[in-house]
């Protein structure tokens, strides 16, 4: 915040594991990166293809194809690639070099304590991610600077490890420990604790047909009561409603409008069918516009990633 106010150098860094299409979680991260980039941050976006290989056994050829789509999504959302650094872990030598250094700063016991009993490749992947997070402070990008890393709360372990490594290697590299923001893990559209690829009805991607997304929203769980009469009398429960949640976190920018929706649901004047219909139109319009932009940016994404 001080760097933004005082117009000093700072960076924002995050990325994506290229295992599938953009969904609301990756959308949240992308929007945060773009926000900080517009505030003057040097922006870095990693394609975590080494992690995808170690964790999901996806080949670099497979993740290359997925990454092109991911980057086209990022560009369509407003990322300025001319003033940012987009890269694949597999191709970024500076990240891999830092991981080699960091290997001397952790023990096997530490990695087991953080990540549990896993194969060595996943521990290596964690060190690669530390290299990603600290890449903005590499001398080639201007050296040490405050860095913010927007991630989901499930990535907290990586940030804690990286801050520890930044302190351990401060004398050698003069790192400033990175800060982080944690975005909300959204409930599944089916009412589950979070959206999951295991259940296609619990989430949607930005590349699904808009009508299919509309159908998922229409079929979604809500915080409504058993009957219309009961809802009008007792009010709905927006706190458990994924429709309210995706609207609040993604598709309605005006806080007053979000508060109005909450209060109308709570007092029973807004019924679930009406709310779903409104949200469905907002989401479908956003997705249609996004897909039009994305289609025009696929070739640019291929060029950025060096894909023929």
Please report, for each region that a protein language model flagged, where it lies by residue.
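Conserved nucleotide- and phosphate/pyrophosphate-binding catalytic cores
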Residues: 143, 156-157, 163-308
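Positively charged, phosphate-engaging catalytic surfaces used for nucleic-acid and nucleotide handling
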Residues: 83-203, 241-243
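N-terminal Rossmann-like or analogous alpha/beta NTP/dinucleotide-binding catalytic cores
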Residues: 1-11, 18-138, 292-295
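Compositionally biased, low-complexity linear motifs
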Residues: 35-42, 144-146, 205-207
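A short glycine/serine-rich beta->alpha loop
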Residues: 16-22, 116-118, 147-151, 231-235
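A generic short-segment signal for beta-strand/edge and adjacent turn/coil regions
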Residues: 13-16, 151, 173, 213
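Active-site oxyanion-binding pockets that recognize sulfate/phosphate
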Residues: 57, 148, 152, 269
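Glycine- and acidic
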Residues: 13-18, 146-147, 261-265
